[in-house]
């Protein structure tokens, strides 16, 4: 007779032989034995032992032996937003981890005996001894058209109070930049609507153009005006002309102006936010922009500003005990910005023909462009727009220094009409600045020098532009044409601004067909040139009167 005791021993032996040691399995064996014993089929028939064994084996193998395994560690120390965690042997760099309090962190330092984790929120809820578990996910953010018109934080969470984002697509924040093969040279214009930029330092789609200057010189104004100017293209039906915008505010005051929000994503990180979030925000915004680039459309991303991101990264690195270098920045601070800005690209037709244009902003101290971070970013980008405090206080706004500002690849993308009228303007303005410095020492100037000074003063006045009033490219062409061709040389400089607004109003109301021709053809034909000259001269005769 097979006793319950023997059956129990058999139940213990079976799973041990098959490598399945489980309380559930043992329990199933006991239940099976009890059921057989209760059925009263004793003594068993000749093959009873084999039947009992097979029944027990079926019950044991049918038991649920799955278990949720989690790799965990413990907090050794916590301070200044940095947690030292013991364990987590297989954690990846920049992997999200979760503390027992529910707060998220990101692993940055992978050391032999511990992991340095930066907290992505208030670290007051983290204590020594807390359990930390891996999530297995590298930091990623939601991407897609659903984000347009929304304000999100560095992790893609909404902070505008308009409910959750419906996007199902997510993308890692730290993706590799496209290589040489998928790219093509910059050839399409990215119009800012600012006369001084579109004529002198043109930007192309897929370019990286740095906006650099001291604080309070109008860097953010140029960026915001560029976003507002895209309204004229995004309101149209041509998808190839549309330019979606991502504005990454790093450590800036909270953005309240919602102009042109329907085609814009705002990634907001204020100065009061944790350093890791200020560090992540540009990469998050870049991933959102890459979604449009890789789907054959065009996007513009503005990083306002990368100086604050570098400071946040320096703060994190020093707290993680990484070796400091020049100006106490870590050795890889160049890589911090290069891996971000290299993701801006113009893709070839085989890869969809999309583009991502980057306008990084860098703040200088007392105009010192030779500091560490400014020189790094200047060497990475394809040109820079240099803003001067002195020009700003003189009332020349935007305060662009024409001599120091340059666009290395954008001229290939400049429209032919603008090239025709603005081709000589940069040279004339540079000569004017040079001569003006010497002219103040003496009054005996020859006629050619006097002419150069007169033209330079009027062109400088003509390039002044108010904030939040970007101009269409055909309107810019007509105004600059009047100045470059010498039609304004005899006008008082103080009247130039008044002339510009009156002339534009006249052209828009009376000569729409000329504007449409310049916009459609992208150039000034001989007939259009003659017509434009006639319009300017006729208007001047009535304006002067």
Swiss-Prot record:
The keyword Transport applies. The keyword Ion transport applies. It holds the Pfam family ATP-synt_ab_N. SUPFAM superfamilies: C-terminal domain of alpha and beta subunits of F1 ATP synthase, N-terminal domain of alpha and beta subunits of F1 ATP synthase, P-loop containing nucleoside triphosphate hydrolases. It is a peripheral membrane protein. PROSITE patterns: ATPASE_ALPHA_BETA. Keywords: ATP synthesis, ATP-binding, CF(1), Hydrogen ion transport, Ion transport, Magnesium, Membrane, Metal-binding, Mitochondrion, Mitochondrion inner membrane, Nucleotide-binding, Transit peptide, Transport. The record marks 405 as: Required for activity. One of its GO terms (molecular function) is ADP binding. GO terms for cellular component: mitochondrial inner membrane; proton-transporting ATP synthase complex. Mg(2+) binds at residues 220, 304. Signal peptide: none annotated. Transmembrane segments: none annotated. It is found in: Mitochondrion inner membrane. Subunit alpha, of the mitochondrial membrane ATP synthase complex (F(1)F(0) ATP synthase or Complex V) that produces ATP from ADP in the presence of a proton gradient across the membrane which is generated by electron transport complexes of the respiratory chain. ATP synthase complex consist of a soluble F(1) head domain - the catalytic core - and a membrane F(1) domain - the membrane proton channel. These two domains are linked by a central stalk rotating inside the F(1) region and a stationary peripheral stalk. Homotrimer. Component of the ATP synthase complex composed at least of ATP5F1A/subunit alpha, ATP5F1B/subunit beta, ATP5MC1/subunit c (homooctomer), MT-ATP6/subunit a, MT-ATP8/subunit 8, ATP5ME/subunit e, ATP5MF/subunit f, ATP5MG/subunit g, ATP5MK/subunit k, ATP5MJ/subunit j, ATP5F1C/subunit gamma, ATP5F1D/subunit delta, ATP5F1E/subunit epsilon, ATP5PF/subunit F6, ATP5PB/subunit b, ATP5PD/subunit d, ATP5PO/subunit OSCP. HAMAP family: ATP_synth_alpha_bact (MF_01346). Belongs to the ATPase alpha/beta chains family. This is ATP synthase F(1) complex subunit alpha, mitochondrial. It comes from Xenopus laevis (African clawed frog). The gene is atp5f1a.
């Amino acid at each position: 007779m097979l006793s319950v005791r023997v059956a129990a021993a058999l139940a213990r032996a079976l799973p041990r032989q098959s490598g399945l040691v489980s309380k559930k399995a043992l329990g199933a064996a006991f239940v099976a034995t009890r059921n057989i014993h209760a059925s009263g089929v004793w003594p068993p028939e000749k093959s009873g032992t084999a039947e009992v064994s097979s029944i027990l084996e079926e019950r044991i193998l049918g038991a649920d032996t799955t278990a949720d395994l989690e790799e965990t560690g413990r907090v050794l120390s916590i301070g200044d937003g940095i947690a030292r965690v013991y364990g987590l042997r297989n954690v990846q760099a920049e992997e999200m981890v979760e503390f027992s309090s529910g707060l998220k962190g990101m692993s940055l330092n992978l050391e032999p005996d511990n992991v340095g984790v930066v907290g992505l929120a208030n670290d007051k809820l983290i204590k020594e001894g807390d359990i930390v578990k891996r999530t297995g996910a590298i930091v990623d953010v939601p991407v897609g058209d659903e984000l347009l018109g929304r304000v999100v934080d560095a992790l893609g969470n909404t902070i505008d109070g308009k409910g959750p984002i419906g996007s199902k697509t997510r993308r890692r924040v730290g993706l590799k930049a496209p290589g040489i093969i998928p790219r093509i040279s910059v050839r399409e214009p990215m119009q800012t609507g600012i006369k001084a930029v579109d004529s002198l330092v043109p930007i192309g789609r897929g370019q990286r153009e740095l906006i650099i200057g001291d604080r309070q010189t109008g860097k953010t104004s140029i960026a915001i005006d560029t976003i507002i100017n895209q309204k004229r293209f995004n309101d149209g039906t041509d998808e190839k002309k549309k330019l979606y915008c991502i504005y990454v505010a790093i450590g800036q005051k909270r953005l309240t102006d919602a102009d042109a929000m329907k085609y814009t994503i705002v990634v907001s990180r204020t100065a009061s936010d944790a350093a890791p979030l200020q560090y992540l925000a540009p990469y998050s915004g870049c991933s959102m922009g890459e979604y449009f680039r890789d789907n054959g459309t065009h996007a513009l991303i503005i990083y306002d500003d990368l100086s604050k991101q570098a400071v946040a990264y320096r703060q994190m690195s020093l707290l993680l005990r990484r070796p400091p270098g020049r100006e106490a920045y870590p050795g890889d601070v160049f890589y911090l910005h290069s891996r971000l800005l290299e993701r801006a690209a113009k893709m070839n037709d085989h890869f969809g023909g999309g583009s991502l244009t980057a306008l990084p902003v860098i703040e200088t101290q007392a105009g010192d462009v030779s500091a560490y971070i400014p020189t790094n970013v200047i060497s990475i980008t394809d040109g820079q727009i240099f803003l001067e405090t002195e020009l700003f206080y003189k009332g020349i706004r935007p305060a662009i220094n024409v001599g120091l500002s340059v666009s290395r690849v954008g001229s290939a993308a400049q429209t032919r009409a603008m090239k025709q009228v603005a081709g000589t303007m940069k040279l004339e303005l540079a000569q004017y600045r040079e001569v003006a410095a010497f002219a103040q020492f003496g009054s005996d100037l020859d006629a050619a020098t006097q002419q150069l000074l007169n033209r330079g003063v009027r062109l400088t006045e003509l390039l002044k532009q108010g904030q939040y009033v970007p101009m269409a490219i055909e309107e810019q062409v007509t105004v600059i044409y009047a100045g470059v061709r010498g039609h304004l040389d005899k006008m008082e400089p103080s009247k130039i601004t008044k002339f510009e607004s009156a002339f534009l109003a006249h052209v828009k109301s009376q000569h729409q067909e000329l504007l449409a021709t310049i916009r459609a053809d992208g150039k000034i034909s001989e007939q259009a040139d003659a017509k434009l000259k006639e319009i300017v001269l006729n208007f001047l005769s009535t304006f002067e009167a």
